[in-house]
């Protein structure tokens, strides 16, 4: 009788442990319950104001020109790189300034050609 009782208790314990493990799996998969654990590993978002940018700008050392968009240190303003070079082309204007324009799926140098046409009033 004692062996049957021990066997039954062990069986119940085994089932309860398996059920608990299953629920923990589903909680983690579908975002339920385990929020506290996830928050510990999640990076914090940057501030919604300009304090993060201002702090980095103030701490950047540059003896020449500090580009406001990328915080790159260059010799003259029109040498500033584009913020997103994978999707932007840099076009230097004749007055010593430069602009970054979206590549927009155009073929190579097509964006620069369109800027020139627009400056001439042809576009």
From Swiss-Prot:
It comes from the Eukaryota. Keywords: Signal. Coiled coil: none annotated. GO terms for biological process: ERAD pathway. Residues 1-21 form the signal peptide. InterPro entries: LCL2 (IPR034543). Transmembrane segments: none annotated. PANTHER family: LONG CHRONOLOGICAL LIFESPAN PROTEIN 2 (PTHR38425:SF1). Probable component of the endoplasmic reticulum-associated degradation (ERAD) pathway. Belongs to the LCL2 family. This is Long chronological lifespan protein 2. It comes from Paracoccidioides lutzii (strain ATCC MYA-826 / Pb01).
């Amino acid at each position: 009788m004692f062996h049957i009782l021990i066997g039954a208790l062990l069986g119940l314990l085994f089932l309860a442990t398996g059920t608990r493990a299953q629920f923990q799996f589903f909680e983690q998969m579908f975002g339920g319950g385990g929020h506290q654990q996830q928050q510990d590993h999640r990076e914090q978002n940057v501030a919604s104001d300009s304090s993060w940018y201002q702090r980095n700008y103030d701490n950047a050392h540059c003896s020449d020109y500090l580009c406001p968009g990328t915080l790159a240190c260059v010799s003259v303003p029109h040498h500033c790189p584009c913020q997103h070079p994978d999707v932007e082309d840099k076009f230097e204007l004749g007055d010593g300034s430069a602009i970054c324009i979206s590549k927009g799926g155009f073929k190579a140098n097509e964006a620069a050609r369109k800027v020139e046409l627009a400056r001439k009033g042809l576009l």
